[in-house]
Protein backbone atom coordinates (compact mmCIF):
# COMPACT_ATOMS: atom_id res chain seq x y z
CA UNK A 1 0.00 0.00 0.00
CA UNK A 2 1.29 3.44 -0.97
CA UNK A 3 1.34 5.71 2.07
CA UNK A 4 0.48 9.35 1.48
CA UNK A 5 1.97 11.89 3.83
CA UNK A 6 2.76 15.55 4.17
CA UNK A 7 6.13 16.91 5.22
CA UNK A 8 6.76 19.79 7.59
CA UNK A 9 10.39 20.89 7.68
CA UNK A 10 11.78 23.01 10.48
CA UNK A 11 14.85 23.61 12.62
CA UNK A 12 14.18 20.42 14.60
CA UNK A 13 16.95 17.82 14.97
CA UNK A 14 15.06 14.55 14.49
CA UNK A 15 12.51 12.93 12.21
CA UNK A 16 9.11 12.18 13.69
CA UNK A 17 5.70 11.20 12.44
CA UNK A 18 2.18 11.79 13.62
CA UNK A 19 -1.12 10.30 12.56
CA UNK A 20 -3.72 13.09 12.75
CA UNK A 21 -7.30 12.45 13.97
CA UNK A 22 -8.51 12.44 10.36
CA UNK A 23 -6.03 9.66 9.50
CA UNK A 24 -3.56 11.80 7.58
CA UNK A 25 0.14 11.22 8.17
CA UNK A 26 2.42 14.16 8.97
CA UNK A 27 6.20 13.77 8.86
CA UNK A 28 8.18 16.38 10.77
CA UNK A 29 11.77 16.63 9.57
CA UNK A 30 14.88 18.75 9.92
CA UNK A 31 15.48 21.05 6.94
CA UNK A 32 18.65 19.17 5.97
CA UNK A 33 16.96 15.76 5.53
CA UNK A 34 16.30 14.79 1.90
CA UNK A 35 12.93 13.66 0.57
CA UNK A 36 14.53 10.30 -0.29
CA UNK A 37 15.59 9.81 3.33
CA UNK A 38 12.09 10.75 4.50
CA UNK A 39 10.68 8.19 2.04
CA UNK A 40 12.92 5.48 3.52
CA UNK A 41 11.85 6.54 7.02
CA UNK A 42 8.18 6.17 6.08
CA UNK A 43 8.75 2.83 4.29
CA UNK A 44 10.56 1.38 7.30
CA UNK A 45 7.52 2.12 9.45
CA UNK A 46 4.77 1.32 6.95
CA UNK A 47 3.24 -1.53 8.98
CA UNK A 48 2.95 0.67 12.07
CA UNK A 49 1.54 3.56 10.00
CA UNK A 50 -1.15 1.40 8.35
CA UNK A 51 -2.18 -0.14 11.67
CA UNK A 52 -2.26 3.25 13.42
CA UNK A 53 -4.23 4.96 10.63
CA UNK A 54 -6.88 2.21 10.77
CA UNK A 55 -7.07 2.45 14.56
CA UNK A 56 -7.39 6.27 14.49
CA UNK A 57 -10.10 6.19 11.81
CA UNK A 58 -12.14 3.61 13.74
CA UNK A 59 -11.67 5.50 17.02
CA UNK A 60 -12.69 8.83 15.50
CA UNK A 61 -15.54 7.55 13.33
CA UNK A 62 -18.52 9.81 13.88
CA UNK A 63 -16.56 12.64 15.50
CA UNK A 64 -17.00 14.74 12.37
CA UNK A 65 -20.74 14.70 13.07
CA UNK A 66 -20.30 16.23 16.54
CA UNK A 67 -21.80 19.70 16.73
CA UNK A 68 -19.08 22.34 16.99
CA UNK A 69 -19.39 25.17 19.51
CA UNK A 70 -20.07 28.65 18.25
CA UNK A 71 -17.72 31.53 19.11
CA UNK A 72 -20.31 32.82 21.58
CA UNK A 73 -20.61 29.42 23.27
CA UNK A 74 -16.81 29.24 23.54
CA UNK A 75 -16.59 32.70 25.13
CA UNK A 76 -19.23 31.72 27.70
CA UNK A 77 -17.49 28.39 28.35
CA UNK A 78 -14.12 30.12 28.88
CA UNK A 79 -15.66 32.46 31.47
CA UNK A 80 -17.35 29.53 33.20
CA UNK A 81 -14.11 27.51 33.18
CA UNK A 82 -12.14 30.41 34.68
CA UNK A 83 -14.71 30.80 37.46
CA UNK A 84 -14.46 27.08 38.23
CA UNK A 85 -10.70 26.57 37.80
CA UNK A 86 -9.26 29.65 39.57
CA UNK A 87 -10.53 28.69 43.04
CA UNK A 88 -9.07 25.19 42.54
CA UNK A 89 -5.69 26.59 41.46
CA UNK A 90 -5.61 28.84 44.53
CA UNK A 91 -6.74 26.02 46.85
CA UNK A 92 -4.24 23.44 45.59
CA UNK A 93 -1.30 25.85 45.17
CA UNK A 94 -1.69 26.76 48.84
CA UNK A 95 -2.13 23.13 49.89
CA UNK A 96 0.85 21.95 47.82
CA UNK A 97 3.06 24.89 48.76
CA UNK A 98 3.74 25.98 45.18
CA UNK A 99 3.52 29.28 43.35
CA UNK A 100 2.35 30.01 39.83
CA UNK A 101 2.38 32.83 37.30
CA UNK A 102 -0.49 33.76 35.04
CA UNK A 103 -3.43 31.43 34.47
CA UNK A 104 -4.92 31.24 30.97
CA UNK A 105 -8.06 29.47 29.83
CA UNK A 106 -7.92 28.39 26.20
CA UNK A 107 -9.80 26.31 23.67
CA UNK A 108 -7.09 23.74 23.00
CA UNK A 109 -7.59 20.79 20.66
CA UNK A 110 -4.85 18.57 22.05
CA UNK A 111 -4.12 19.45 25.69
CA UNK A 112 -6.05 19.64 28.93
CA UNK A 113 -3.46 21.81 30.60
CA UNK A 114 0.16 22.88 30.59
CA UNK A 115 2.70 24.52 32.87
CA UNK A 116 5.57 26.61 31.52
CA UNK A 117 9.03 26.77 33.07
CA UNK A 118 8.05 30.24 34.35
CA UNK A 119 5.06 28.78 36.18
CA UNK A 120 2.38 30.04 33.83
CA UNK A 121 -0.58 27.69 33.71
CA UNK A 122 -2.89 27.01 30.78
CA UNK A 123 -6.15 25.09 31.09
CA UNK A 124 -8.57 23.89 28.45
CA UNK A 125 -11.99 25.53 28.67
CA UNK A 126 -13.56 22.11 27.97
CA UNK A 127 -12.69 21.14 31.55
CA UNK A 128 -15.85 23.04 32.51
CA UNK A 129 -17.81 20.23 30.79
CA UNK A 130 -16.06 17.51 32.80
CA UNK A 131 -16.82 16.17 36.28
CA UNK A 132 -15.26 18.25 39.06
CA UNK A 133 -12.82 15.45 39.95
CA UNK A 134 -11.36 15.59 36.45
CA UNK A 135 -10.89 19.35 36.73
CA UNK A 136 -9.20 18.92 40.11
CA UNK A 137 -6.90 16.26 38.64
CA UNK A 138 -5.73 18.52 35.80
CA UNK A 139 -5.10 21.38 38.26
CA UNK A 140 -3.09 19.10 40.58
CA UNK A 141 -1.22 17.65 37.59
CA UNK A 142 -0.15 21.08 36.33
CA UNK A 143 0.72 22.42 39.78
CA UNK A 144 2.84 19.30 40.42
CA UNK A 145 4.97 20.45 37.49
CA UNK A 146 5.98 23.42 39.66
CA UNK A 147 8.09 20.93 41.63
CA UNK A 148 8.83 18.38 38.89
CA UNK A 149 8.94 19.55 35.25
CA UNK A 150 8.68 15.97 34.02
CA UNK A 151 6.53 12.86 34.44
CA UNK A 152 8.88 10.93 36.74
CA UNK A 153 7.83 8.58 39.54
CA UNK A 154 8.34 11.46 41.97
CA UNK A 155 6.00 13.63 39.90
CA UNK A 156 3.26 10.96 39.86
CA UNK A 157 3.73 10.37 43.61
CA UNK A 158 3.05 14.05 44.20
CA UNK A 159 -0.06 13.94 41.99
CA UNK A 160 -1.29 10.88 43.90
CA UNK A 161 -0.62 12.53 47.27
CA UNK A 162 -3.09 15.31 46.46
CA UNK A 163 -5.39 13.33 44.15
CA UNK A 164 -5.43 9.67 45.28
CA UNK A 165 -7.95 8.68 42.57
CA UNK A 166 -6.09 10.46 39.76
CA UNK A 167 -6.01 7.31 37.61
CA UNK A 168 -9.82 7.32 37.42
CA UNK A 169 -9.83 10.98 36.35
CA UNK A 170 -7.10 10.32 33.78
CA UNK A 171 -9.14 7.41 32.41
CA UNK A 172 -12.19 9.67 32.04
CA UNK A 173 -10.14 12.03 29.84
CA UNK A 174 -8.78 9.13 27.81
CA UNK A 175 -12.28 7.76 27.18
CA UNK A 176 -14.08 11.07 26.59
CA UNK A 177 -11.39 13.51 25.49
CA UNK A 178 -11.69 13.01 21.73
CA UNK A 179 -15.44 13.51 21.81
CA UNK A 180 -15.13 16.67 23.91
CA UNK A 181 -12.34 18.13 21.79
CA UNK A 182 -14.30 17.41 18.61
CA UNK A 183 -16.62 20.23 19.73
CA UNK A 184 -13.89 22.82 19.11
Task: Give the location of each predicted region.
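Active-site-proximal or metal-binding-adjacent scaffold patches in catalytic folds
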Residues: 1-137, 146-184
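Walker B catalytic acidic pair
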Residues: 142
